[in-house]
Amino acid sequence: MKRILSTVVGLILSGSIAFATEAAPDCIANGQVLPVNNEQVLQWKNNTKNQYKNRGHIYGVVSKIYQGKKSHQHFQVKLADGPRDTIEVIYNTSFNEIDNLKVGAVVESCGDYITSNARTGHYPASPDGAILHWVHESTNSARHESGYVVVDGVLHGMPHGRPFYDYEWEPNFDSLAPAM
């Protein structure tokens, strides 16, 4: 934990952060822009039944990368200071692999939230008790709104690197900064 916080603090204090390298899209939920909702996501994780679904827009730090997955990259994102304040993000590698994914990376992601604290069909429970998936451009907009993953300022989830929107994106580290 100290390593993650010191990494975040170092990034905050660094005047040469190169994060605005690509534009991040708005996170859309039911046709409206959804702000980062880490607190709401953690409330859903702790207070809803298995398979509860909603729209999530998270901002945090990669704290673990799950190995042994084939067509998807699975990784844990720390959303707050509590030991279980995490979510598993599941990214479809058919939109290219996230080549800059590493523990300590700063992540913003938008996608479909699902409480996953028990096996459902052939899907095991998430080790984090909740997942964020469909974090890429939607191939079926009637079923899913598009999502994305930004890792250390690089946008992922768009085919062939096509930008989603064209505007400046600036990370907000305020919610991750330790209390002074």
Tell where the protein language model's regions lie, with residue ranges.
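OB-fold and OB-like single-stranded nucleic-acid-recognition modules
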Residues: 21-180
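Bacterial N-terminal signal peptides
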Residues: 7-16
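Positively charged n-region of N-terminal signal peptides that target proteins for export
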Residues: 1-4
